[in-house]
Amino acid sequence: MKYLKPINEFWGDVLKRDLLGETRKEDNIRSIEELRDYIISEIDRHGKNVVIKNLDISSIEDVCWLFSGRHDLESIDLSGWKTSNVTDMNNMFFDCRKIKSINLSGWDTSNVKNMGALFWNCRNLESLDLSGWDTSNVNTIREIFYNCEKLESLDLSGWDTSNVTDMRYAFSNCPAPYEVIDNKIVKK
């Protein structure tokens, strides 16, 4: 049997959310299952424009496929998430076809090794700022922006790809101002 919060705790969380104008989870998320359940509840609550700020997922290593196939999402703000132990972001936003805006500012990506197909087929994504992401431990960005056909504004300044061994199709069918030359990301 699943533990249910007493009603006063539940309404306390709702009141905190409404007063602050943003989603805040006071204690950290301890498992990917708990994170998935929480995200589904927030998507149900917010609809196509989701705001889940300052979430502590520091005990989770794998966020693969987390939002994949969410054709209903148009914008998502996940700024300020505590992601210091995440190592695998493979396919996190895979096939989010309608999404136009994603805010991932403030993420600690220093332990991430796999960013393969992270934004694969986010065909309506128009701009994305990933500057400041520590990519020094990443070894694959294969198909990271594959088929992001409207992504013209992309900021990857500060990216260190010296340990990346697989960059295949990273910018295929993507108008972003970057390309892969000699296994390095360069501005066009």
Please place each PLM-identified region on the residue numbering.
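Negatively charged
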Residues: 2-188
